[in-house]
C-alpha cells in the first residue's frame, strides 16, 4: 500500500515559503526592534522536518445532523484554516489567506532565515505547520470530494504583518505570525482547473446515480459496499487509484479511493461515516485506510471495502463489513497520529453488528442516539409540548408522556 503512504506524506513535501518583504517589527519591555529581520529565501518542507525529527508533534458527514467530523476537534487556528479550506469543494487555485485567531510565536537565535540553525528551523516549522496542517488534514478527511487537491505542491507562506523583536534577557529573536497564506494546487493528472471541474461533475453525477435500496441501514450499507466492489477493482497503477474517482467514475483504485467513495455515498444517504487511517509502518512506508460507520443502535462499526475486494473476483466478501473491535482489530490498527495531526476517532463497538438484532438503549436515551444527554431532555420537552416524535418519551415508565417525564430526565442527567 505504498501509494497510501505517498498520499499520507503529500503535505509533507509542500514548500513553506517565508515572505521576506515588509516584515514589521515591535519592541516590548526588554525587547528591541529588529528592522533588519530577513526571512527572504527561506524554504522549508514538512517532509524534511519529519525525516530529521520524527512525527511526534502534538498539536454530512459534512455537518449533517448526528454526523462526526474531525473538524470539531481542532484548536482556534486550525478551525480557521478548516473553515477556509472546506470552501475548496468548489475547486480554486486562488490564494487562501487565514487570519489566525491566536498569534503564532516562535524563537530563533538569529533574525535571518538564511542563518537558521537546525533548532531554529524546527521551532519555526513546529509553530507554523502546527497552526495549519491539522486543519488541512481534517478537511481532506471530512470532505473527500476535495479529491483534486495536491498538498505536495501547496505553498504556505506567512504574511507580511509578521513581526520580529530581540529579547536581551533571553538572547533570542521572537517572531509573531498573524497571517498564513496557502496556495492550493491540483494534481498534475488534471491538466487544468477546467479538468478538475469536469471530474468533480462526473463524481457528483456518479454519487447521485448510485441508487441503492434497503429497508434498513444494514441493507443500504451492504448495497453501497457491494456496488463499489462490483464497479471497481484494486489497482495501484490506475490513474485515479487514490481518489474516489477510481471507485465511482473510472475503475482502478486502492484503499484511499475505496474508503473515500464509501464515505461519499454514506454522506449522500445521511449515514454518519468517517475515514480511518492506520496500519502505519514508517520503516516500510506503508499505511492503510478504511471506514467507521454508525448504525441505528448508536454504535460505530468498521468497514473495509478494500480488503473485501482484493482478489477482484465477482464474488463479494463480507469479512470486514460492520465489524467490532474484537474481530476487526486483529489485523487493523488505527493510528491517531497522522504525522503532526492528531485524529480523534469514534469509539468502535466491541462486537460485530448483528442485522435484525433489537438494540438495547440506556435508560434516558429517548432519541436513540446511543448516549444520554441534554439532547434527550430537549427531545422529551418537545414531545410534552406536542411535537410529533419518533420514539416514546415516557421516561419514568408511568404509561403516559407528561411534565413528570421532563422532571425525571432532569434528575437523571444531574445524578
Predicted segment positions?
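Stable alpha-helical elements in mature extracytoplasmic
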Residues: 77, 81, 132-135, 199, ...
Amino acid at each position: 500500500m505504498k501509494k497510501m503512504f505517498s498520499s499520507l506524506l503529500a503535505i509533507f513535501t509542500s514548500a513553506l515559503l517565508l515572505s521576506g518583504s515588509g516584515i514589521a517589527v515591535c519592541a516590548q519591555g526588554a525587547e528591541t526592534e529588529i528592522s533588519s529581520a530577513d526571512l527572504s529565501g527561506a524554504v522549508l518542507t514538512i517532509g524534511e522536518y519529519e525525516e530529521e525529527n520524527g512525527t511526534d508533534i502534538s498539536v454530512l458527514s459534512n455537518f449533517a445532523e448526528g454526523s462526526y467530523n474531525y473538524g470539531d476537534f481542532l484548536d482556534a487556528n486550525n478551525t480557521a484554516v478548516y473553515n477556509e479550506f472546506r470552501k475548496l469543494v468548489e475547486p480554486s487555485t486562488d490564494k487562501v489567506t487565514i487570519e489566525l485567531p491566536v498569534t503564532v510565536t516562535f524563537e530563533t537565535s538569529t533574525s535571518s532565515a538564511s542563518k537558521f540553525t537546525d533548532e531554529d528551523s524546527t521551532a519555526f516549522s513546529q509553530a507554523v505547520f502546527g497552526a495549519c496542517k491539522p486543519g488541512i488534514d481534517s478537511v481532506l478527511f471530512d470532505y473527500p470530494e476535495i479529491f483534486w487537491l495536491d498538498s505536495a505542491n501547496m505553498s504556505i507562506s506567512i504574511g507580511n504583518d509578521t513581526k520580529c523583536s530581540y529579547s536581551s534577557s533571553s538572547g533570542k529573536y521572537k517572531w509573531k505570525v498573524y497571517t498564513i497564506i496557502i496556495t492550493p494546487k491540483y494534481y498534475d493528472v488534471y491538466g487544468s482547473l477546467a479538468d478538475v471541474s469536469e471530474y468533480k461533475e462526473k463524481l457528483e453525477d456518479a454519487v447521485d446515480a448510485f441508487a441503492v435500496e434497503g429497508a434498513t441501514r444494514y441493507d443500504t450499507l451492504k448495497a453501497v459496499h457491494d456496488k463499489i466492489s462490483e464497479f471497481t477493482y484494486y489497482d495501484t497503477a490506475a490513474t485515479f487509484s487514490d481518489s474516489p474517482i477510481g471507485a465511482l467514475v473510472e475503475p482502478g483504485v486502492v484503499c484511499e479511493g475505496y474508503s473515500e467513495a464509501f464515505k461519499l455515498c454514506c454522506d449522500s444517504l445521511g449515514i454518519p461515516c468517517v475515514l480511518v487511517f492506520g496500519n502505519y509502518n514508517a520503516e516500510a512506508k506503508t499505511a492503510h485506510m478504511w471506514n467507521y460507520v454508525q448504525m441505528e443502535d448508536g454504535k460505530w462499526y468498521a468497514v473495509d471495502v478494500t480488503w473485501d475486494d482484493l482478489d477482484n473476483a465477482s464474488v463479494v466478501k463480507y469479512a470486514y463489513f460492520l465489524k467490532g473491535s474484537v474481530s476487526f482489530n486483529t489485523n487493523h490498527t488505527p493510528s491517531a497520529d497522522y504525522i503532526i495531526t492528531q485524529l480523534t476517532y469514534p469509539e468502535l463497538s466491541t462486537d460485530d453488528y448483528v442485522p435484525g438484532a433489537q438494540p438495547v438503549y440506556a435508560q434516558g436515551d429517548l432519541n436513540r442516539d446511543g448516549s444520554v444527554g441534554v439532547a434527550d431532555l430537549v427531545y422529551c420537552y418537545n414531545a410534552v409540548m406536542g411535537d410529533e416524535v419518533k420514539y416514546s418519551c415516557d421516561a419514568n415508565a408511568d404509561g403516559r408522556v407528561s411534565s413528570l417525564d421532563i422532571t425525571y430526565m432532569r434528575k437523571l442527567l444531574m445524578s
